[in-house]
């Protein structure tokens, strides 16, 4: 395990982060800690300020402090103290100084770093009075608003239909129920009865589990698996298909099917740490041409229903291979329905930690092995299907009783009315490649859902939605690497879920060169010029933290974070006086944290 961090910047105790954790790691990893010793970003004169502060205020061992890789010396005005008579004057003066930096250094960025959200708003107001374009990062984060969380919840259920939090947000945000607690209870109750909210969208009167039991009872299902040249459903080839037929949870005797397929594409030599067994199998078995082998499988399937483990992958790569090699046969027309034992296990056993085929065989003591050969994997999947069939039959009575409750029927109808068409249309688009000139599928889906919510009065207008759209388009998603919604969700949904407003600051979508940000939001960002606003005792450290040693030390680190956002120039601003509770002027003192570094500033 590797831990990366900088203890000088540990400022999130209010969110539960504890500096004691670093002490534990330091003791645990004694003798095996690597410190980066060269600072490649900061000019030497700025690093001297930060190192002096770290050593004398933060009490960091001088041997652990970095060295500059340059000998840059400070020019006049690059480290400077700024004074204003009062806090009200300081808002105006700092805004005017930011204007000066903006005009004098036309390719550079400037940040005004404040200690509170209210200061950020007042500084922003002063900048607006000067008609100076700027980007404010403070208060409620754009990505933390209920509106944006609702938009992302839609993307999340498309990426993972079993996402409990995303469904809960949708149920509340779409006003199916009134409260967050009620939304969570509804989704949890569905889960406890083998249901997802999507069941109410996919079925008018039934469920995925009920459909599975009915189909297994009335028809034969084809349990199949594929081995392929890779994981891309759009471009990779199938090299083996294996299948068996089942009815009422039992394998139909003599129904085994297997075919190997010739390909000129490269086959991976290893699957993780193991040698890819399909390479040896292909050497010892007849390999059919693509079109012949695929048609053999379709003839075998006939009118039966397909089932696979993680069937979305197998079904869609089969569909793309058919389109490529069999005169454009569309599997969605030929076999429009398929089941997924992975989804069934999620529904029937919602509390498992793993759902891979190998894990299920071990957990439920089922016969078979996950060998990465289609015929062996089909045997294992068939045993999982048999388990699912019996487990599902035992659940049906309770599930139907739950769905018959008036409250559940009311919620289901509301969800259908508001969300069914949006959800089903989006699912149909998941595996549709888009032309290069088109809007990115993920962005198009996000904006389509946003427009629908606006039109139905379910959200207010999101002022920053354009930033999100542009950021995803220009900085996150590469159209040349993934051009379908399913690929873009698979590659980027986790990253999108962790986005913060501050991420926009270092992106190409923010054209502004002046930023207003709180210290906590500034962490991780960097700017050419930094103005630390109103650096007085009472703010650094906070008045209420002065008797608490731990909070006092954290405030010292906050001030370090504020200063260290600078790449070139650093300005410390303060107001000289304030009006006390008795309406009397009182002098302000420059923060005590400046004492050991004051000599560097003019």
What feature does the model see in each segment?
Residues 240, 320, 515-544, 570-571:
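A short beta-strand element within the Helicase C-terminal
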Residues 9-13, 138-159, 323, 336-354:
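Short alpha-helix plus adjacent loop in nuclease-associated cores
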Residues 30-32, 39-132, 283, 454:
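Helicase P-loop NTPase motor core
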Residues 1-52, 538:
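Conserved helicase motor core of SF1/SF2 NTP-dependent helicases
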Residues 387-388, 510, 536-602:
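C-terminal accessory regions
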Residues 160-222, 230, 245-247, 411-517:
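Accessory C-terminal helicase-associated subdomains
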Residues 28, 105-212, 362-366, 378-380, ...:
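ATPase/helicase motor core of nucleic-acid motors
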Residues 219-222, 229-327, 331-332, 351-366, ...:
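Conserved non-catalytic scaffold segment of RNase H-like nuclease domains
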């Amino acid at each position: 395990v590797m831990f990366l961090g900088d203890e000088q910047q540990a400022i999130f105790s209010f969110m539960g982060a504890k500096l004691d954790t670093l002490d534990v790691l330091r003791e645990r990893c004694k003798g095996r800690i690597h410190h980066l010793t060269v600072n490649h970003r900061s000019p030497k004169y700025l690093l001297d300020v930060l190192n002096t502060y770290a050593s004398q205020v933060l009490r960091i061992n001088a041997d652990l402090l970095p060295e500059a890789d340059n000998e840059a010396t400070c020019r006049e005005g690059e480290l400077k103290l700024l004074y204003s008579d009062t806090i009200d004057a300081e808002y105006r003066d700092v805004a005017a100084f930011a204007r000066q930096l903006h005009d004098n250094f036309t390719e550079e960025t400037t940040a005004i770093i404040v200690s509170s959200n209210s200061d950020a708003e007042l500084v922003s107001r002063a900048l607006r009075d000067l008609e100076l374009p700027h980007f404010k990062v403070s208060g409620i984060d754009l990505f933390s608003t209920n509106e944006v969380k609702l938009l992302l919840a839609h993307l999340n259920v498309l990426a993972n239909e079993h996402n409990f939090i995303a469904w809960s947000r949708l149920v509340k945000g779409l006003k199916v129920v009134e409260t967050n607690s009620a939304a969570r209870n509804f989704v949890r109750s569905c889960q406890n009865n083998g249901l997802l909210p999507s069941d109410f969208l996919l079925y008018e009167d039934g469920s995925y589990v009920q459909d599975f039991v009915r189909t297994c009872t009335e028809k034969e299902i084809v349990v199949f698996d594929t081995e392929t040249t890779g994981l891309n459903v759009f471009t990779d080839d199938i090299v083996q298909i294996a299948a068996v037929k089942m009815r009422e949870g039992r394998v139909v005797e003599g129904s085994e099917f297997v075919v190997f397929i010739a390909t000129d594409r490269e086959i991976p030599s290893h699957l993780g740490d193991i040698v890819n067994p399909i390479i040896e199998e292909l050497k010892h078995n007849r390999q059919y041409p693509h079109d012949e082998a695929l048609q053999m499988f379709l003839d075998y399937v006939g009118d039966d229903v397909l089932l696979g483990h993680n069937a979305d992958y197998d079904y869609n790569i089969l569909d793309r291979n058919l389109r490529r090699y069999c005169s454009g046969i569309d599997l969605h027309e030929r076999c429009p329905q398929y089941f997924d034992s992975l989804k069934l296990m999620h529904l029937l056993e919602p509390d498992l930690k793993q759902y891979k085929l190998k894990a299920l065989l071990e957990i439920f003591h089922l016969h078979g092995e996950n060998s990465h050969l289609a015929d062996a994997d089909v045997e294992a999947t068939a045993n999982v299907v048999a388990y699912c069939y019996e487990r599902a039959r035992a659940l049906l009575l309770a599930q139907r009783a739950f769905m018959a409750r008036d409250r559940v029927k009311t919620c289901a109808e509301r969800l259908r009315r508001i969300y069914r068409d949006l959800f089903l249309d989006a699912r149909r688009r998941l595996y549709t490649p888009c032309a290069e000139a088109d809007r990115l599928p993920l962005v198009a889906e996000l904006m389509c859902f946003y427009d629908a919510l606006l039109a139905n009065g379910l959200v207010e207008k999101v002022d920053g939605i354009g930033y999100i759209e542009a950021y995803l388009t220009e900085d996150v998603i590469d159209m040349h690497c993934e051009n379908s919604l399913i690929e873009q969700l698979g590659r980027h949904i986790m990253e999108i879920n962790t986005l913060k407003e501050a991420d926009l600051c270092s992106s190409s979508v923010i054209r502004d060169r002046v930023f207003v940000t709180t210290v906590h939001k500034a962490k991780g960002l960097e700017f050419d010029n930094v103005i630390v606003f109103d650096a007085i005792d009472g703010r650094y450290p906070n008045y209420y933290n002065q008797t608490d040693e731990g909070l006092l030390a954290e405030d010292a680190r906050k001030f370090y974070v504020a200063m260290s956002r600078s790449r070139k120039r650093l300005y410390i601003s303060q107001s000289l006086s304030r009006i006390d509770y008795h309406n009397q002027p009182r002098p302000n003192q420059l923060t005590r944290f400046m004492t050991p570094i004051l000599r560097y500033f003019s």
